[in-house]
Amino acid sequence: MIDTLLEPFSYGYMTSAILVSTIVGGLCAFLSAYLMLKGWSLIGDALAHSVVPGVAGAYLLGLPFAIGAFISGGLAASLMLFLSERSGLKTDVVIGIIFTAFFGVGLFVVSLYPMSISIETIIMGNILAISYSDMLQLLIIGSISLVILFLKWRDLMVVFFDESHARTVGLSPSRLKIVFFTLLSASIVAALQTVGAFLVIAMVVTPGATAYFICDRFPKLILLSVLIGSVTCFTGAYLSFFIDGATGGIIVVLQTIVFLGVFLAAPKYGYISARLKIRQANKRIENGF
């Protein structure tokens, strides 16, 4: 029994997949707390699709895909930030323009210059086929991003809560937003290998949304988000060995199940709890009359 449970760790590719998935899951979950706070969930989706031309360009130039994806994602994030602040357009309009433009360019490049990597690999991900060099890149990206987040989480929290107050205490909202979007681009680059461009939005939204139903204070929300992201990614990668299914799909399904369970049963803000409170309030009103 124990030998069966430990069998995945006897294979190098599974150990690498589990390790990378856990770190990337924690990083994406950390950022998801801020996306929930600001209501920027769709920006994560836009950036996930905006890295496609960068990946295509990197392969054409013989560069690591992470470099191209990071440059493309950073450019898309900068354009979204610039247009949101200077054009007067609503954020969702800007996201739609940037998302479709970058993804369209990526598909166009791939169609013109067939590559050894298929567009399906970019979109769906394949963590089990990760090479040692790719794993090292992702671990470096994830570790550096987590260190920066640990150092700057409080400043980012102030900016995301109230930019005016952030300026009065000497912080630069624009500079910190650039830092945040850079970290978001880095996390999406890392997550691409894990779940692909289509499912990465779940990793940067679902953990924060789940923790939102449980926590009242933002620091606790961050910690719980990271815990949810790391545990579900670890479990999903581990279970994929026995289920023989797509690792990314299993991870996202697990995160969705956890979200639905918390949404229904959270003691303070869950759906069932809210309905019971409404029913109790109605009874008090009836008894009062």
Located regions from the model:
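Cytosolic-side transmembrane-helix boundaries in multi-pass membrane proteins
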Residues: 245-289
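Structural signature of hydrophobic alpha-helical transmembrane segments
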Residues: 13-25, 63-75, 139-143, 189-203
